[in-house]
């Protein structure tokens, strides 16, 4: 499992460094802004992605948006959006997606770690 996760992480880093990543990230953020509903929102991105802050702030939304670098270790990329008024969050960070896929694999295979 660890080898698969390391390979997946390497593929994610490769994707982040590609020309397709910026478009993917902006579309995920736009989708998440809709999903969390109306209200003030904070968008957390990796410190490497903070260079996209101005583009993110231009995404059409009627709410107040704040963009911040996530302080999480291994955030990798992607975004986490929090509606600060409604306390609703959508997590499209690669860290979360990898964790979810690992859990799905462990559940479907019947393996247990510990």
Can you annotate each of these PLM segments?
Residues 1-114:
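Elongated, mostly alpha-helical coiled-coil "stalk/stator" tethers of large membrane protein machines
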